Amino acid sequence: MSIFIGGAWPYANGSLHLGHIASLLPGDILARYYRAKGENVLYVSGSDCNGTPIAIRAKQEGVTAKDIADQYHEEFERCFRSLGFTYDCYTRTDSEHHHETVQNVFLRLLEEGHIYKKTVEQAYCETCTQFLPDRYVEGICPHCHEAARGDQCDACSAILDPLDLLEKKCKLCGSTPSVQETEHFYFALHTFQEQIKTAVENVKQTGTWRDNAIQLTERYVKEGLQDRAVSRDLPIGVPIPVEGYEDKKIYVWIEAVTGYYSASKHWAEKTGEDDQEFWDSEAKTYYVHGKDNIPFHSVIWPAVLLGIGEGAIPRHIVSNEYLTVEKRKLSTSKNWAVWVPDILERYDPDSIRYFLTVNAPENRDTDFSWREFLYSHNSELLGAYGNFVNRTLKFIEKYYGGIVPKGSIDVELKDKVEGLYKHVGEAIEQTKFKVALESIFDAVRFANKYFDEKQPWKQREDNPVSCEETIYNCVYLIANFVNLLEPFLPFSSERIRNTLSIVNRNWEPQHTLPSRIDSVQPLFERIDVKQIEHEVEKLYGAVK
């Protein structure tokens, strides 16, 4: 089976925060799981280097947009690598390859009659002497009356036009923009109304889109899909490939989602592989992002794919809700965030991955609390999983000289492990990552109980053969926990693999066990509560 996984493209205008990772981490879990199953996986993403936020930041700092994009693209790559993300292709939207691919898609849509020209009114700043792209205009949402940008309201998820806003202001200088006529290209989104409606009806039956994606898309369909501008007067971006319009740029909402397609084509060129299997109707596709990106993946991207004749419209939409920080809405402008480069300096990446999975905002907003982070690490990773692994391996090191004793697999444990692979696999495929990880840790707690009830420290004196059986079965459980937890906790899984010399990485019960162990080290270190108190003080002290 061909599995395509697309992770949303973060804007390269500032550091990643935990909210980004909370929405993107499911993509890596899926990719690792499906590879272990032996499926053909293509997992792509990249940095959005063409967005208006980058141009705004560059202007504020007196540098070029490329300077900003280069800085954060490189930082993103380091962060994703440090967190264990296994992208097959992580690229950027200001690359020549991306520009060519997007222009080809634009021309195909134009040739098929899905794009047309239209004279429209647009916000114009007399002070800055320029037309204002959507994100250069800020004001009040006409629907919910919250602060909003000219392209979308984060509060109510309404897709907006800058002229819809109340109390409009130029983001660059703060003046009230005027309205002038200009010519732009438009995407005939209304012509895909019935196809999008059918797609939503289908996923309601299969349950393969998150509820928030279904509900929001149903709302758009009910209101009637509106044609959207596909060009803008932007300072940076992909030029319109039509004579006389080269100064205009392809609008980011269609250009950025086409990044999945361009990254796929880039991967194919780089590897010599054929990527077409990931774009036909038989492919299993997952799009992983936050709820603010829903309309771009549930309406616009499917319409683009239908418009260019590709069959692989999103089968799974994994649209997480928001992550708050210490019960407050995350705010980058106020520096109310936990920044990824910062947290990676001091904490195990598996601790971050574990917390953001068991506390994932899958169906509702969830909160990152430093105290809860401490608890999840010390109680679950260290106290449950690390404890079981270390007590078993230390016992072997101390009493068997590092040689794993002979034994036979307990039938009850064997059935439990085989059932766990099936249950966890199904949960991952259904994008229920929290359920999957909690099921494994239920088994970890069972394993600790098994060790305690068998009391191998007594068996060693009273019944050495039973002791060997107990320890053998504990190693059996560890070997399988390593495989089951690989998609979630790749770093600790790798450490145990090295200790036990486990080679098999397939998603299947491990019945062949290692014969010896090498240099047992603690799987996790305890986090001191004083360190967490310092983190909380630092967070509150950094607020602008």
From Swiss-Prot:
Binds 1 zinc ion per subunit. The keyword ATP-binding applies. A motif ('KMSKS' region) lies at residues 329-333. Signal peptide: none annotated. InterPro entries: aa-tRNA-synth_I_CS (IPR001412), Anticodon_Met (IPR041872), M/V/L/I-tRNA-synth_anticd-bd (IPR013155), Met-tRNA_ligase_1 (IPR023458), Met-tRNA_synth (IPR014758), Methionyl/Leucyl_tRNA_Synth (IPR015413), MetRS_core (IPR033911), MetRS_Zn (IPR029038). Zn(2+) binds at C141, C144, C153, C156. Is required not only for elongation of protein synthesis but also for the initiation of all mRNA translation through initiator tRNA(fMet) aminoacylation. PANTHER family: METHIONINE--TRNA LIGASE (PTHR45765), METHIONINE--TRNA LIGASE, CYTOPLASMIC (PTHR45765:SF1). Belongs to the class-I aminoacyl-tRNA synthetase family. MetG type 1 subfamily. This is Methionine--tRNA ligase. The lineage of its organism: Bacteria, Bacillati, Bacillota, Bacilli, Bacillales. The gene is metG.
